[in-house]
Amino acid sequence: MCRDMLPQDIFDYDPKNLWDYYYKDGIYYIDHHQSHATYAFLNSNFEQSDILAIDGIGSKYRCVFFDKDQNLIDLSDELPIGWLWNHMSNLTGFGTLGASKLMGKVGYGKYSEYYYNIFETILNGPITEKKQKHFQHIKLDNIDNLAHTLQKFTIDKIKEYVYPLKTCDNLC
């Protein structure tokens, strides 16, 4: 396995800044979310920006925020939105890594208070990588509405947790 071939201290790498990196014995490494954030920033053409990277998995994080000075703030516990999208895409038949397919349904649905409350309840519970057995009790009578509501939920959570951290007008 690839993990066995890498130096063990690479797994202890803990970036504090957007441009931090691990380098040893010819191995260059940056964190998965750091990579997403860097790509977003470099392609934004902003000279300065806050950056948000949300994803379902990564070696260390689920969600990170970089302020305008490029300092990393770990929001993995507060905002595991990518994790929720992954689990909902699996539940709706799009597969564990099919969140983009579920996102494609957003424009076809309507807001559902039922789904919104479900998402609130889920994020108030344990966030684990294992399949959540209680998810099977979620009614899937309208996947379009689930997707639409999950997008609204995502935006609301970003406003709740990320907007207070903003240090400039730009956000990647």
What are these regions (language model features)?
Residues M1-Q8, T167-C172:
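Short glycine-rich phosphate-binding loop at a beta-alpha junction
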Residues D12-D31:
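Conserved catalytic cysteine-centered active-site region
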Residues D25, E47-S49, T167-N170:
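Short coil/turn segments at beta-strand junctions that form active-site/ligand-binding loops
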Residues D25-Y28, D141-F153:
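Short, surface-exposed alpha-helical recognition segments that flank or form part
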Residues H32, L79-W83, T149, F153-K157:
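Conserved active-site and cofactor/substrate-binding residues in soluble primary-metabolism enzymes
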Residues H148-L171:
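Phosphate/ATP-binding catalytic cores across multiple sugar-kinase/actin-like superfamilies
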